[in-house]
């Protein structure tokens, strides 16, 4: 089926996103120039330019030039806060050849700008970016010139940029993890954890945090390629190869679309279809089949088999554009149905119920661009060897890098994907909703080809917060009710509509826990639960043996890190639980007291700091064992356990 006009809703989404999917180019006639060298940065208002790292952040650039101390050491967090209040500029020069400028099209592609950025090319304003979570594709052929070209990006302070919204809002949102008296984080589509959390450093940075490229094309380009699984049996996989193709030329274009498929080095199988591309965006659907498909399996069940798919656009016997994906053939359902005990909540993979064993994942570093490919590989090796099969990407961080989802595919790890909203109500004015729509469009399209992606979740704990965290007492009734109306617009209307439009085969829940139970016994039989009776409620570890949910999507207990880690941020003279340095790395206001309270129940409190740290780690392990074993013992009533949390973003 060929749709030469395209659906209005899809076109609207593309215009909102201004987005291009991150993809691998190979064996085609396009040319990709990576702009990751020659960058300089400067504090706005000064003329001191220094070499910059791209992708990168202004904090890391300042650290590299010894203009900031190591933010993770001692109490240095206090010494870096001035950066968030300043504007910063980045610039580079690159060369365009006469041959490149003869191409039919040139696109400047930013995969990530953090966050408020004005982009200039040769002095012309191309873009005013305002969302960290989307990529931007800008046609630039008319702005380019033969020889040297100048690219300049002006980053506005995310603090000063959002102060006018705060001042006109009339109240301070209850975003208490934002470590500032004015809670500005909710106004920006920017990683919430960067403003601080009850385990995290505050480092509100700016920068070009994902790759920048210029792409030159002739005739046509592929802006999206979705391999949609229609039906799967042991005998046959029926697929639809859905492409969004841009005919760059001002006239109809005769072309051939070729779909290539191979498996583990086997001979490539191809199907082709002749098409006429109208000028502009064309939507093309080409059916294909895989006989005797080898299914993608989760970790512990078998091999996570992946097929290689590529789509090529051929004009006059020349491949002018190509996109490729690795595709896992499988079925995944989130079974959420009424039963004799309440409401089930479990993953069914390839028709078989699966007990979820895993954890909640937060960003691996306070400075995201410091996470190397090697760190991603180590993370997933550890996840696999720990016999996990599910990771929840928590909603206070970021939509992860492509490498994360590729490794999840390769290691058989299902991904529970939150949208990036956590622990506070958010605005719902038209401008904010438009940004969120662009964000949802971009990331659903970017991630939907991954076999590992199991589900979408609207937010972390926001409905629970609205119901149980005292907002009804702390805000006037009209504001409190507006928070609920805003919740409905975001999480019951906008986001599920985008999932249905762009990724209809995946399950969406509006929040986790979706019943908003806050550990109440009457709701343990319904859906997923966050049980913080242990820790905040000071209930015993033994209570986890009996406080049983259908699916435990969060529970946990804090400890200090190992002494090896403590030695990276504290000197021996700081080795006291309540020292200034240790308190700076304890972000929970009740953390030290609760660790001591629980320790007193089962152990003699050690006097020596190193012993206290060690016993605290044992204590944490003891508590987690109670929960993990209880959840596994009680299946199929309980069908999953995800502890909080898998990792840290700094030494804390």
State the predicted function of each range.
Residues 1-7, 11-390, 630-634, 638:
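Secreted/periplasmic carbohydrate-active enzymes, especially glycoside hydrolases
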Residues 31-34, 40-48, 53, 193, ...:
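Substrate-binding clefts and catalytic carboxylate motifs of secreted carbohydrate-active enzymes
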Residues 115-117, 160-161, 204, 335, ...:
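Flexible loop/turn segments at secondary-structure boundaries
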Residues 148, 354, 386-391, 409-414, ...:
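Loop/turn elements at helix/coil->beta-strand transitions in domains of secreted/extracellular proteins
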Residues 339-345, 401-403, 438-446:
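Alpha-helical scaffolding within the catalytic cores
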Residues 357-359, 391-393, 415-417, 551-553, ...:
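Hydrophobic faces of well-ordered beta-strands that scaffold small-molecule active sites
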Residues 390-434, 527-529, 535-538:
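Aromatic-lined substrate-binding rim segments of carbohydrate-active enzymes
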Residues 410, 427-519:
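Active-site neighborhood of glycoside hydrolase catalytic domains
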């Amino acid at each position: 089926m060929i749709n030469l006009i395209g659906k209005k809703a899809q076109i609207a989404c593309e215009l909102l996103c201004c987005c291009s999917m991150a993809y691998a180019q190979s064996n085609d006639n396009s040319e990709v120039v990576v702009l990751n060298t020659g960058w300089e940065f400067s504090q706005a208002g000064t003329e001191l330019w220094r070499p910059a790292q791209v992708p990168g952040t202004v904090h890391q650039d300042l650290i590299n030039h010894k203009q900031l101390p190591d933010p993770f050491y001692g109490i240095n967090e206090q010494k870096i806060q001035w950066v968030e209040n300043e504007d910063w500029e980045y610039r580079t020069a690159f060369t365009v050849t006469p041959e490149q400028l003869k191409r039919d099209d040139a696109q400047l592609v930013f995969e990530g700008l953090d966050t408020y950025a004005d982009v200039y090319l040769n002095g012309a304003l191309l873009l005013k970016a305002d969302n960290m979570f989307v990529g931007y594709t800008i046609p630039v052929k008319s702005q380019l010139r033969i020889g040297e070209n100048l690219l300049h990006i002006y980053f506005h302070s995310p603090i000063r940029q959002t102060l006018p919204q705060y001042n006109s809002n009339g109240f301070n949102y209850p975003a208490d993890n934002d470590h500032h008296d004015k809670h500005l984080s909710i106004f920006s589509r920017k990683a919430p954890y960067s403003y601080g959390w009850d385990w995290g450093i505050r480092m509100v940075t700016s920068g070009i945090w994902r790759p920048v490229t210029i792409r030159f094309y002739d005739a046509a380009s592929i802006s999206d390629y979705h391999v949609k699984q229609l039906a799967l049996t042991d005998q046959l996989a029926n697929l639809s190869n859905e492409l969004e193709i841009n005919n760059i030329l001002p006239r109809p274009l005769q072309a051939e679309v070729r779909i290539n498929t191979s498996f583990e080095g086997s001979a490539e199988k191809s199907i082709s279809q002749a098409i006429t591309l109208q000028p502009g965006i064309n939507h093309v659907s080409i059916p294909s089949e895989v006989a005797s498909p080898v299914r993608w399996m989760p970790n512990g069940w078998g091999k996570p088999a992946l097929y290689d798919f590529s789509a090529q656009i051929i004009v006059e016997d020349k491949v002018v554009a190509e996109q490729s994906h690795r595709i896992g053939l499988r079925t995944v359902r989130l079974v959420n149905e009424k039963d004799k005990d309440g409401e089930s909540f479990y993953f069914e993979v390839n028709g078989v119920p699966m007990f979820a064993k895993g954890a909640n994942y937060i960003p691996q570093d306070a400075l995201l661009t410091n996470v190397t490919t090697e760190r991603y590989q180590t993370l997933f090796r550890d996840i696999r060897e720990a016999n996990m099969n599910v990771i929840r990407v928590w909603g206070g961080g970021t939509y992860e890098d492509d490498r994360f989802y590729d490794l999840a595919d390769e290691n058989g790890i299902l991904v529970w994907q939150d949208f990036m909203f956590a622990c506070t109500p958010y605005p719902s004015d038209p401008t904010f909703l438009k940004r969120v729509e662009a964000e949802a469009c971009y990331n659903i399209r970017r991630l939907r080809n991954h076999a590992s992606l199991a589900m979408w979740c609207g937010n972390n704990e926001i409905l629970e917060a609205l119901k149980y965290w005292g907002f009804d007492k702390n805000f006037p009734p009209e504001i409190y009710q507006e928070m609920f109306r805003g919740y409905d617009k975001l999480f019951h209307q906008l986001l599920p509509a985008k999932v249905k439009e762009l990724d209809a085969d995946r399950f969406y829940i509006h929040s986790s826990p979706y019943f908003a139970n806050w550990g109440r016994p009457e709701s343990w039989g319904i859906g997923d639960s966050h049980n913080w009776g242990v820790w905040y409620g000071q209930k015993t570890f033994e209570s986890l043996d009996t406080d049983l949910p259908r699916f435990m999507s969060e529970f946990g207990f804090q400890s200090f890190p190992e002494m090896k880690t403590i030695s990276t941020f504290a000197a021996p003279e700081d080795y006291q639980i309540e020292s200034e340095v240790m308190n700076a790395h304890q972000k929970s206001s009740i953390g030290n007291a609760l660790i001591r309270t629980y320790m007193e129940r089962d152990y003699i409190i050690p006097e020596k700091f190193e012993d206290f740290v060690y016993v605290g780690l044992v204590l944490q392990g003891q508590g987690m064992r109670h929960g993990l074993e209880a959840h596994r013992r009680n299946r199929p009533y309980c069908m999953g356990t995800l502890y909080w949390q898998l990792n840290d973003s700094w030494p804390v």
